[in-house]
């Protein structure tokens, strides 16, 4: 859903209830989380399987190389940003997956399963405790894992709220075209 007329021009913040939504609206796999000034997203925190830290770090390099070889690889996910963090606060190593994207929670998860199954690139989640072995053929189990490990934010802010990644790229292409045009006029 694109930003409405000039909705993007005024920064916006949204305080979100503890549950992660304002009213229960059922999606395919559970409650629908709201679109916020930062679009859609989730923060998943899960314990890392013993001895898998190096595999997770290496997987970051795999994704980097895959994107270098095929820049549009993750395009079906309609991502703005991904951030991965490993941390230990005394209870074992944990992994945090933060994603900001333009689709709802359930669609993002379904698209991720499809993308990883078709591309042959697996998911980093295979290194996490409790992640289902049959994730490629059992979307319900994949979604259950993601929802069980989702920690909803309670505040989201957007400097340019509700703007999709496609709208941002379009604006940047337009800016580049204008710059090129002005350079030609010199």
Question: Which role fits each region the language model picked out?
Answer:
Residues 2-94, 100-115, 131-186:
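Short S/T/G/P-rich N-terminal loop/turn motif that feeds into the first structured element of a domain
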Residues 118-133:
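Conserved short beta-strand edge segments in small beta-sheet-based binding/regulatory domains
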């Amino acid at each position: 859903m694109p930003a409405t007329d000039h909705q993007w021009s005024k920064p916006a913040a949204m305080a979100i209830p503890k549950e992660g939504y304002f009213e229960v609206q059922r999606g395919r796999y559970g409650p629908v989380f709201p679109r916020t000034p930062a679009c859609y997203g989730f923060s998943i925190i899960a314990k890392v399987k013993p001895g898998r830290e190096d595999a997770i770090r290496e997987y970051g390099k795999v994704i980097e190389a895959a994107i270098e070889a095929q820049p549009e690889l993750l395009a079906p996910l309609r991502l703005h940003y991904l951030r991965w963090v490993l941390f230990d606060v005394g209870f074992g190593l944990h992994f945090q997956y933060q994603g900001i994207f333009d689709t709802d929670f359930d669609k993002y998860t379904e698209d991720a399963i499809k993308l990883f199954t078709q591309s042959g690139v697996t998911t980093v989640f295979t290194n996490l405790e409790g992640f289902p072995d049959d994730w490629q053929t059992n979307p319900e189990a994949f979604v259950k894992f993601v929802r069980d490990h989702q920690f909803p934010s309670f505040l989201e802010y957007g400097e340019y709220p509700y703007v999709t990644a496609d709208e941002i790229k379009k604006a940047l292409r337009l800016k580049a075209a204008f710059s090129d045009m002005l350079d030609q006029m010199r």
